[in-house]
Amino acid sequence: MDARFDGRTVLVAGLGVSGRAAAQVLADRGAHVVTFDDRAPEADHRDVAAFLAGDGLAEVDLVVASPGLPPHHPLLAAARERGVPAWSEVELAWQVRVPRDGGGGEAAPWLAVTGTNGKTTTVGMLESILRAAGRRAPAVGNVGTPVVLAAVDPQVDVLAVELSSFQLHLTHSMSPQAAAVLNVAPDHLDWHGSLEAYAADKGRIFERTQVACVYNAADPLTAELVREADVVDGAVAVGFTLGTPAVGQVGLVDDVLVDRGFARLRHTHAAELGTLADLAQLAGPDGAVPPHVVRNALAAAALALAHGVDPVHVRDGLRAFAPGAHRIVTVGRVDGVAYVDDSKATNAHAAAASLAAFGEASVVWVAGGLAKGATFDELVRARRDRLRGVVLIGVDRAPLRDALARHAPDVPVIEVAAGETEPVMTRAVQEARRLAAGAPAGVPVTVLLAPASASMDQFASYAARGDAFAAAVRALGADGVSPRDDGPEATP
């Protein structure tokens, strides 16, 4: 039992994976758990209006809320009005941590990652580096495994924690050993209400950081979030850059990843962490490692170094890292055209990074879905030179169509609407093949699924969307499917 929870009534709002885990951990600690979920038949309460009208919060001591509940949700608004504290599952995890075996009574430290894009890849790289160093280090959080289950496992040495802005919003006391914000670009504005609110929630990850705040030297907003954070005395800021690093940064010298943030002689020397060849398994169809992948590797390296990992283990971990599905994966080739699945590119920032990996006028772009209030002018303006043609899918085709008309009027655009005989993705891939066939002989062409939008309008998840793309490519008679496509990961 835990005196903080024993006999207390805790409302767990949302019975997804993290909500169920929270309910289990709370019950194990003696709490009286009440559940709410308007889509789960087993929930104690499903109608928020009826629950609140019946004064359902009267006996509630704490709300543990799913990341799916926005701040303006009636349940959270009512809890604020009554003064009932609300936590995320991540906050609960921090509160219930247990001492790790062999840790001298200390709980496992957390290495935390957030950002608009690249979180899952970076946390996966970090996990691989930590395991190469002999640490028992699960990747947890938004990547799939609830943080709260790892927090109560004494067999864990260190946690590689992926956190979304949703999770951070109701996280109040977490004190990570090191934390990183990879980038900040407009996303989930329907949930947060504004870019400023979204960025502020991302920045919460740096609060109370103990050793190092890792930021993107090419993204001034991430550096600003470090400056605004209240950290533990002695914590340092470490930037990552694709250029030659200054003191206090990790970066790239020719094809070598180097450290000038933690190395003992960093004022005069850089310590080698690995080379781009150690990331060869992440190369795109042209054989080059995409810039955003290198940034992710540098961020993961910085977090691992903050934990005390040796540079040789950074190299070994990056070499061993196996990328997840739906992240710039070549799923087949038809008539010399590569078909690449980057269904995980669920916003404009991610799609821009994906398109940047390809050459001029070489991409037939399959895009569209649920826009979440986003605009696409900046994306199209920045990447129009990559486009040979565009196939639009999804319910929110209009914002992309209009941006293309304004900034890339010469690029042919085909729209595929739902409700016809064949599945949307089958027709999209067929149209993309026709556009690709118009390229001059000898010109390399890639059909790229990088939707810049969420998937839930027409697919169960970004993974289901990517699977549908791969299936449609196979139906064309693709002559090879990438062995990297090893199954879907958790939703972002």
Residue ranges and their predicted role:
Residues 29-44:
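NAD(P)-binding Rossmann-fold cofactor-contacting core
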Residues 34, 138, 391:
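Conserved beta-strand positions in the Rossmann-like core of class I SAM-dependent methyltransferases
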Residues 27, 54-58, 67-236, 430, ...:
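Phosphate-binding loop of NTP-binding sites
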Residues 14, 26, 63, 113, ...:
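Residue-level signal for inorganic ion chemistry
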